[in-house]
Amino acid sequence: MVREEEKGIPVRVVRCRPLVPKETSEGCQMCLSFVPGEPQVIVGSDKAFTYDYVFDPSVEQEEVFNTAVAPLIRGIFKGYNATVLAYGQTGSGKTYSMGGTYTASQEHDPSMGVIPRVIKLLFKEKEQRQDWEFVLKVSYLEIYNEDILDLLCSSRERSSQISIREDPKEGIKIVGLTERNVASARDTVSCLEQGNNCRTVASTAMNSQSSRSHAIFTICIDQKKKNDKNSSFHSKLHLVDLAGSERQKKTKAEGDRLKEGININRGLLCLGNVISALGEENKKGGFVPYRDSKLTRLLQDSLGGNSHTLMIACVSPADSNLEETLNTLRYADRARKIKNKPIVNVDPQAAELNHLKQQVQQLQVLLLQAHGGTLPVSINSMAPSENLQSLMEKNQSLMEENEKLSRGLSEAAGQTAQMLERIIVTEQENEKMNAKLEQLQQHAVCKLDLQKLLETVEDEELKENVEVIRNLQQVLAQFQSESAAAAEAATEMANAEQDAAGEAETGQVTKRSSDDFTTQHALRQAQMSKELVELNKALALKEALAKKMIQNDSQLEPIQSQYQTNIKDLELEVSNLQKEKEELILALSMAKKDVNQAKLSERRRKRLQELEGQINELKKKLNEQAKLLKLKESTERTVSKLNQEIREMKNQRVQLMRQMKEDAEKFRQWKQQKDKEVIQLKERDRKRQYELLKLERDFQKQASVLRRKTEEAAAANKRLKDALQKQREAADKRKESQNRGMEGVAARVKSWLANEVEVLVSTEEARRHLADLLEDRKILAQELLQLKEKKESGENPPSKLRRRTYSITDLQASEMDLSLSKQIESLETEMELRSAQIADLQQKLLDADNGDRVKQRWDNIATILEAKCALKYLLGELVSSKVQESKLESSLQQSKTNCSDIQKMLIEERNHATEMEAEFQNQLLLQEQQHQQEVLYLLSQFQQKEAPGKGVEDSLSEQEKQMQERLKFQEKELEKMREICEKNQELLQENDVLKQKMLLVQVASGQKLRRDQQVSPESPDSPFDYIPPKPKTRRQTVAKPRAPTPEMNVEELFSDSEESGEEEDAEWVPVKAAKGTKKSATGCFCKGRCGNRQCGCRKQKVGCTAGCSCDSTKCRNRDPGFQDATVCEDQTKDSEGSFKLEDLRDVTAGETFFQPVYSPPTMKVLKDITDQGVFMKKPSTAASLLVRDEESQENQLPFVKKKKRMLSSNTSFFSGCTPIKEEID
């Protein structure tokens, strides 16, 4: 383990799976071989790869785990990170090796993969370490289409929140990923099952359960020692199941599957680039493209980082996957060069504490060594020294001084704010002055000619006023000129800055914006100040009014008290007077009764009047006092209202002042920021000025150097002119030598490039042939499997084996009736031959695809001259190939156009032939119906002839009538037959023309000609059959023939009826027609020796004549005497125009087509008629005949020929007819 840690080389394992049933059924062979006892695998015959471990197909899962994976798991408890990585093409067994489809029900299954075995081993090791505390967390994610998906999250909504972060201490971290605490193996397996159920899986042509994403199952382990909390470790275990690399040609992926495959291959390509960058020894410390893919980003620690890594390269042994297997082995071989640097992962705080403790111990040891091995007692009880006290005092004084300075700074800030307010006020006054100045300028527009006015004005006072106005105008003009000069100076300064710094526009915009902001601030301040002044005035007025009213109230208080006293006295006096009045009224009323008291009552009356007057006066005074009191109350209300308004105005003034201060503070901050910017701009301007000076100095230096160089150039120009001639001569000589050398180099480079191109083209052709051979072997394997199944089930062998083939023996075997065993043996032999060819081609491709040759291909080009020659040659070859390709494309297009035209013509001819065939068949049916009616009529006449009960006296007369009728009828029929013969001759000629056209069309379309020979019914699918490909349709059948019927063309159908002859078969069974492609109207048309009964002349018991189509040198049926007699007899019959009717009773069974009357001779005829009716119920259309192969025609024509023979064999009988339906009924 120590050596492994020092080297830091990840372990590489190659595991080979056995052939799957699909590969076995396709006939695939093993392309890998393993060296017993050595970790070596051999591809083909001589290409060997060596790894740390190699497992052949017979090795079980347990051995793989114990040998390669278990050591990594034990290192996890020591604080090391570990990664187990499965890589390979799709369908090579990665998920099987990793256990990606494991469930709890497979606990004791020997095929259990790496992940469940790791879980078991982890918890087993955990139970053995009782002095440690463990915390285990698991997470499960997949990378699907470059998106990270959390497989332990119930909803996929959190997947968008997952991100990858890099911690300098902990390495790669995944933020937002679900981590679950697990305490037992059962909990961990349940998390694994949940993730496996959520993983993306789909079916492809290579694998029914193909993983469509990269899956990473991570187990985090935190362990702490129980008796030492500072001793802790943190480690991670990544179990990675990569999706397999795939080719769209083999997987047949489309749509989403194709997109998934593209993303999978992209991620694996990035992984390969990372492995290549890490494995190149000459580029140590170079850039590693971890960030090109999320897969490589997550595996950054596992590849070249802090981790022990195990890569399991899964390969397929089938020779059909040889190229992918070779790429996988090379991939794993590159990964062997990666060197990781694993370290023990400890808690950083605990590590820091341990480091500090070690440092303290070291310092204590040093102190002990300095004091002679003992620590002095004064170290623990030593008080703070005087130096420390002085420092503390100094620190205290500095803090006090800092506080003073802070207070002074705050006061200075306040004063600054006041100064800013004064500046604002001053600016406002300045703005007012400017406004007045503008007004004066407006008034000064209409300037008067003061000099003329002075001359015309005589009044002294007016002259003085005009003089004052003129002085004011002079002052105004001077002020304007000064302002203009100041503006010009500012403009010049701005222009100078623009020339120096190149930022005049920006400065002007900034200055303009600053001036606008300042003006707006000043206007706001002025407006608020004006509002404040008005508010203060109104407040002062209201305060004065309130004060005045309060003073009046204070003065009214003694008067009010006096008035109240007077009111009370007056009220008392009024009440007394009222009482007195009442008494006087009572006394007066009493006095009226007493006459003696008249004078007294008079006095009392007067007194009463006086009292009433006093009472009225007192009431008036009371009313006035009441009015004064009401006035005081209203005054108090007014005072309270004024006080309320004063308070509101004070609040408003406070708010306004606060707003002014805030605005002033904002302006101060803005001003401070602008001052900083101005300082920065000035600093930048100084730098630019310095750079400008530096550039000027450099320019002067360059100018001086340029002058010196110009002088030197002028001096050297003369020398150059003298040397030009020599240079031209040398250049001409060098050019001649280069041309001579270029010819040899061009020839060498051309031959080398031609050889390389030929090798590459041969390699590609070999690959193409290899693919064809693999496909051919697959088809052969399928056919072999079908034959074996049929042999087991006892079925008959197929009539033809449809397959691709490269040998002529296959064509011959397709037409032969082989037994199943022979066919199986031949297929096995062919498969062995194909396998040998495949192995040979694959070995040659392995030799041709040598990686060193590809790298050293361009080493032969070492100079620019050779490169130019190579480019010139390649460019010429490219142009010539493009021109040739263009010619071939135009030729192909023309051929396609011609082919389409010929196909159209062929379709038209077929349509015409179909129409003609339908028409001929209709005519044939009509003729046959007529013939059957005649036969029935003759039979009925024959039965009547034999029937008893007829009188002798009536027989002669009736017989004469019948003979006359027969003669008439025969003459009519002869006329009809002559017409039919003429039509047949015309149709035969037309048929010959159509055949010639059909032949021309087939030759023009490049199709093979159909052989006009009888095809065996056991092999109707001959490879020389009709060539134009058509979809196979359901064959239209007619009534079953009892014997194989030969094919018949149109000439045979409409040939002369006399060629068929008589048949000796009692049941009218038609015999086979002789083979031939062309038949004449008379005589036989045999191709052979005319030795059997298939010869038409031999059937009629006549010899062959010169009109026959048979070969006279081979014919055995040529008898001149017999032949001439037959011909003369035929001519005699034709010249008479009628036939001699024989007595039906004298006809023997051997010389007629009918049996005697007592036998039922019409059953065969009726059956044939019924079959013909069934045949006519299915008429063939032009469209169906276009897609029908020649097999249907071969099946129909013999039946038609049979009917034609039946028609031609009865031309000597003519009679009335009876409907067929009656006879059938």
Swiss-Prot record:
Alphabetized GO MF terms: ATP binding; DNA binding; iron-sulfur cluster binding; metal ion binding; microtubule binding; microtubule motor activity
Biased composition, class Basic and acidic residues, residue ranges: 719-738
Gene3D superfamilies: Kinesin motor domain
Composition bias, Polar residues: 507-520
Annotated region described as Globular, given as residue ranges: 1004-1225
Tissue expr: Expressed in proliferating cells; neuroepithelium of embryos.
Designated name of the protein: Chromosome-associated kinesin KIF4
Annotated organism of origin: Gallus gallus (Chicken)
